[in-house]
């Protein structure tokens, strides 16, 4: 990242396993130094600065030639640059310096949760088309029925999958692969809660799936995209991948390159 400047909490979250909140605590505890001087919460790390945590030098990843943001998209935001209907779009919430970052897939207007964005087209394309696991917390109307469970286990093919979709959707039929996994958290006549894991990203896939069983989706939150978890990231906030996530991303990209080269 040539010419970069980051607040100390961002730097630590970017290049270590610590969250921004944990990084702030480390700074307050006096465990962080910049060029051998104790860091403050307002300290900014510049390109040639040396940052130490507990006297150990933090070395930025030399092979990281791209950046990836993790954004906790709120409900009521569109994953788009602009909207003719004047609805709020994600780039109105993100800092202007991220205007050139592209989203990895979509998360519909009424849903919230993990949305990844990157300044690398190759990374965006790889993450979008790799069939990585996506984990969701879903709240639906009514009971989780045996028919639903059978479809989650065995898959489902619908010639008419427009229920749960936008009125003007061009996608009429849809085939749903068996879910990777699911857990029924609450099963009640008024509403039920599930944790589901899928590895597809079709248009309003989960809303269409549950609508077929007359179970409208009341709430939908994506809590994991591949190796990136939402964890405690507040709604409307963004962070960089941490060191562990970047390591996993580099391994993932290297593996894809090796597969293509075979």
UniProtKB/Swiss-Prot annotation:
Q: Per UniProt, which keywords does this protein have?
A: Isomerase, RNA-binding
Which Pfam families does the record associate with it? PseudoU_synth_2, S4
Show the active-site residues: 108
Under SMART domains, the record lists: S4
Report the Gene3D superfamilies cross-referenced here.
Answer: Alpha-L RNA-binding motif (3.30.70.1560), Pseudouridine synthase I, catalytic domain, N-terminal subdomain (3.30.70.580), RNA-binding S4 domain (3.10.290.10)
| Keyword RNA-binding attributed | yes
Q: What superkingdom heads the lineage?
A: Bacteria
**Limits of the S4 RNA-binding domain:** 6-70
Q: What class of enzyme is it?
A: isomerase
| Gene Ontology biological-process annotations | enzyme-directed rRNA pseudouridine synthesis
User: EC?
Assistant: 5.4.99.-
Which GO terms fall under molecular function for this chain's record?
RNA binding; rRNA pseudouridine synthase activity
- UniProt keyword S-adenosyl-L-methionine present: no
The cross-references to PANTHER family, in alphabetical order and at most eight, read: PSEUDOURIDINE SYNTHASE FAMILY PROTEIN-RELATED (PTHR47683), RNA-BINDING S4 DOMAIN-CONTAINING PROTEIN (PTHR47683:SF2)
Give the family from UniProt: Belongs to the pseudouridine synthase RsuA family.
Mind telling me what this protein is named?
A: Uncharacterized RNA pseudouridine synthase jhp_1352
Question: Source species, please?
Answer: Helicobacter pylori (strain J99 / ATCC 700824)
């Amino acid at each position: 990242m040539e010419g970069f400047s980051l607040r100390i909490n961002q730097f630590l979250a970017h290049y270590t396993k610590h969250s921004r909140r944990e990084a702030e605590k480390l700074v307050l505890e006096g465990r962080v130094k910049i060029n051998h001087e104790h860091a403050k919460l307002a300290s900014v790390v510049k390109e040639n600065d040396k940052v130490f945590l507990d006297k150990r030098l933090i070395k930025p990843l030399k092979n990281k030639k791209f950046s990836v943001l993790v954004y906790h998209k709120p409900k009521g935001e569109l994953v788009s640059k602009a909207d003719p209907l004047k609805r709020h779009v994600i780039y109105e919430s993100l800092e202007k310096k991220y205007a050139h970052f592209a989203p990895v897939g979509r998360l519909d207007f009424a849903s919230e949760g993990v949305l990844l964005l990157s300044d690398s087209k190759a990374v965006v394309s790889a993450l979008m088309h790799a069939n990585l696991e996506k984990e969701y917390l879903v709240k639906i109307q009514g009971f989780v029925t045996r028919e639903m469970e059978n479809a989650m286990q065995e898959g489902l093919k619908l010639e008419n999958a427009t229920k749960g979709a936008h009125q003007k959707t061009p996608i009429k039929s849809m085939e749903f692969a068996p879910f990777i996994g699911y857990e029924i958290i609450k099963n009640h006549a008024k509403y039920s809660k599930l944790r589901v894991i899928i590895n597809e990203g079709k248009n309003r896939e989960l809303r269409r799936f549950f609508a077929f069983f007359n179970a409208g989706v009341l709430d939908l939150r994506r809590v994991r995209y591949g190796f990136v978890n939402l964890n405690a990231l507040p709604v409307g906030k963004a962070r960089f991948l941490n060191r562990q996530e970047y390591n996993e991303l580099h391994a993932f990209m290297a593996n894809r390159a090796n597969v293509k080269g075979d």
